[in-house]
Amino acid sequence: MKVFCGRANPTTGSLEWLEEDEHYDYHQEIARSSYADMLHDKDRNIKYYQGIRAAVSRVKDRGQKALVLDIGTGTGLLSMMAVTAGADFCYAIEVFKPMAEAAVKIVERNGFSDKIKVINKHSTEVTVGPDGDLPCRANILITELFDTELIGEGALPSYEHAHKHLVQEDCEAVPHRATVYAQLVESRRMWSWNKLFPVRVRTSLGEQVIVPPSELERCPGAPSVCDIQLNQVSPADFTVLSDVLPMFSVDFSKQVSSSAACHSRQFVPLASGQAQVVLSWWDIEMDPEGKIKCTMAPFWAQTDPQELQWRDHWMQCVYFLPQEEPVVQGSPRCLVAHHDDYCVWYSLQRTSPDENDSAYQVRPVCDCQAHLLWNRPRFGEINDQDRTDHYAQALRTVLLPGSVCLCVSDGSLLSMLAHHLGAEQVFTVESSVASYRLMKRIFKVNHLEDKISVINKRPELLTAADLEGKKVSLLLGEPFFTTSLLPWHNLYFWYVRTSVDQHLAPGAVVMPQAASLHAVIVEFRDLWRIRSPCGDCEGFDVHIMDDMIKHSLDFRESREAEPHPLWEYPCRSLSKPQEILTFDFQQPIPQQPMQSKGTMELTRPGKSHGAVLWMEYQLTPDSTISTGLINPAEDKGDCCWNPHCKQAVYFLSTTLDLRVPLNGPRSVSYVVEFHPLTGDITMEFRLADTLS
């Protein structure tokens, strides 16, 4: 059965109705899931297996039958571990129907159908009794309900319900306990992801400073956690202000509460500085004695950094304090972790708070609109003074006396740069009400509300009256649009340039004047694992899961790239970067598709995991901004990526085939095509068999 789905096209800006298979969402969720990453997490799998064996043994030693409840079973892996360890029966709960169906097949293939019952329900809907899903309460509770924040996937309510209704009072739990850790730091880099810094512009009249409105400075920021691969943040980017502090623990073998709570830890600052950011992670102990431990600690907090396990399904958290506060070395302070049923947040206090008073402190929520419009990488991009200087220098070369500028980018400061650098009149278009209001406030606090005209409408709908009857001599864009997911989605600027053609003066300048799509073939240190088949996991056959992921990838995404912030995922270039397509913004969009075919020679040995693609914008003939590679690769090929942008990764089909040898074909062929009508860029990269 086919269904019609309405989707906003991020490149053309139009609303499209697409005919999709009724199971499209299922396939998309499977294709973009972390199931493969979890199966490749050997440390996790081994520790769970050890903990399960120990729990089953403790129950058997008491002379009891081992009845297991496995919540969030996924592939059924942990249930199969339990049965192999000697459990008498296992009830495996999985709410996602396609996953539950796969678990049934995997359990059957491994010969455990007589000992494992897969139940396709949310655990809070599971019943116990003669006519229930379980005949009696279980005495072993196994779960994998955790996300990077520990409780963000609803672990606390699920545990709370399970203890009340599904498991015995003295049950064994795997994991047995979780502990959340925090470390207070000062970090201009990370703080720049949360606050708008003053922006400096050198002009003929001296330095001008663009300042943020007071409501932006007071705003506590976005409520969602910032989860990143903290091991990729250089220690030079932050100053440690506290030891690693154990903030709170949850004992999963006892009744768990999902009620709001707070936990305070007094500490003595290791250094004086501005307390801005809390780095946080957790570990889980699989047994009551804490001998079997799985930790998410970054390398500097590991007892043995050499044994660091890479994983993408669990990372580390960055929390921003509502406001930065000075701390003095040796002067005690109190860090407080607050949580409700799904979220964690932090505050810094002078004394230990009364538990009851702070338990219900309201979770920080953005009230300035900026954190709803700009994500954290975008804040970092706007705060990048070198980037601002680059745009300012380019503007100086194209601005002329009497220039009438039209700026088209979401929530951009370009219009203010243009004004300060001498434009006679500046218009800026903000499509959303939120960005319109935000920019009005920023202009007002900088006394520019009468200098820059803000137009709240889609740029395609601009009229001569909106521009006060004037013709535009300089069309500006970064370009940046909040709807863009992949690098080339910002080609929406080209569509806007085409639609406003009648408002441009003869000889009008467009900045950027052109864009180009670039690619390089890479070998990832670890990211390949999220798309690599597992086959066998701790002795269990999970090929069915591999096939399921491959089918979902083939369903829609086999020829699509996916966005990843590659500064978090180290890789080596195996080829030289190559320009694939160019787009001339000085001209309207052509009617016919643009295609590029070619071959990329592999100049370094390694496993070709995929092609990385990014956009470069030629602001002027002598000035270019890259959203991808920002430095030439070093001798070994190590890549340095723009930290404010996501790059596009096209995983080669060989990433899904472990049989391809390391030193296989020495070139990659490609076909890339831009379709002006839809704004789509279709592509195919494949290893060329140069050996035959």
Swiss-Prot record:
One GO location term (cellular component): cytosol
Chain positions found as Omega-N-methylarginine: R32
Cystine connections: none
Catalytic activity: L-arginyl-[protein] + S-adenosyl-L-methionine = N(omega)-methyl-L-arginyl-[protein] + S-adenosyl-L-homocysteine + H(+)
Pfam families documented for this protein: PrmA, PRMT_C
Disruption phenotype: Mutants, shortly after birth, display significant reduced body size, reduced weight and shortened fifth metatarsals. They are subviable with about 45% of the expected number of mutant pups at P14. Surviving adult mice exhibit increased fat mass, reduced length and limb abnormalities. They also have reduced bone mineral content and density. Knockout mice show sexually dimorphic phenotypes, including changes in bone mineral content, bone mineral density and fifth metacarpal length that are only significant in females.
Gene3D superfamilies hit by this protein: Hnrnp arginine n-methyltransferase1 (2.70.160.11), Vaccinia Virus protein VP39 (3.40.50.150)
InterPro entries: Arg_MeTrfase, MeTrfase_PRMT7, PRMT_dom, SAM-dependent_MTases_sf
Subcellular location: Cytoplasm, Cytosol; Nucleus
Active site residues according to the UniProt entry: E144, E153
Keyword Ribonucleoprotein: no
Domain SAM-dependent MTase PRMT-type per the UniProt entry, residue ranges: 14-345, 358-684
GO molecular function: histone binding; histone H4 methyltransferase activity; histone H4R3 methyltransferase activity; protein-arginine omega-N monomethyltransferase activity; protein-arginine omega-N symmetric methyltransferase activity; ribonucleoprotein complex binding; S-adenosylmethionine-dependent methyltransferase activity
Chief place where the protein resides: cytoplasm
Subunit architecture: Homodimer and heterodimer. Interacts with PRMT5 and SNRPD3. Interacts with CTCFL.
Free-text function comment from the UniProt entry: Arginine methyltransferase that can both catalyze the formation of omega-N monomethylarginine (MMA) and symmetrical dimethylarginine (sDMA), with a preference for the formation of MMA. Specifically mediates the symmetrical dimethylation of arginine residues in the small nuclear ribonucleoproteins Sm D1 (SNRPD1) and Sm D3 (SNRPD3); such methylation being required for the assembly and biogenesis of snRNP core particles. Specifically mediates the symmetric dimethylation of histone H4 'Arg-3' to form H4R3me2s.
Family: Belongs to the class I-like SAM-binding methyltransferase superfamily. Protein arginine N-methyltransferase family. PRMT7 subfamily.
Protein name, entry field: Protein arginine N-methyltransferase 7
